[in-house]
């Protein structure tokens, strides 16, 4: 009888673990992850990136994103497709897919949920995208080091992901040593990207 109880307890534990019920106590406030194209500080408790750094260096465009989808990484608790389902939040790349279209391997890395933020669809497809395009013009002349910092509101989705309140992108020009920073509220933009500059 005692053996049967032990077996049942073990099966219950394994079942709960498979469903993720035991993951919550081990979630990290911040974990640093280095890839070959970006370094990200990710909050598993918020299910969002909190800071990300990448270099933009005039890479040739050799591949298209096609039907690539975001994917979860092993060993990290991130957001997932449910957080973006039927709402105003886009899966916003922090390190842009178009900047790393020089190889299929690099492009795929940009589709990790570690590189994905809950971003207002009008911001993601509007002024944020236009600033990314401008970065790729600037990096024709000199390499850029781009740092993105994410701030958060108190809003949490029913799916448990925290909503960012703003995104600050600082672009360092490595030759001229100039830095330009832009802060965007996570809402529908009401002005040109240039007007979001804060320094």
Where are these regions (language model features)?
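Domain-level detector of nuclease and nuclease-like folds
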Residues: 74-199
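Sec-dependent N-terminal signal peptides
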Residues: 4-14
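Short, extreme N-terminal leader segments that mark the start of a protein/domain
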Residues: 22-33
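Hydrophobic alpha-helical membrane context
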Residues: 14-15, 105
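Generic detection of long, well-ordered alpha-helical segments
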Residues: 30-31, 43, 49-50, 110, ...
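Boundary at the C-terminal end of the N-terminal hydrophobic targeting segment
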Residues: 16-20
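Short, His- and charge-rich active-site/binding loops that engage polyanionic ligands
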Residues: 31-90
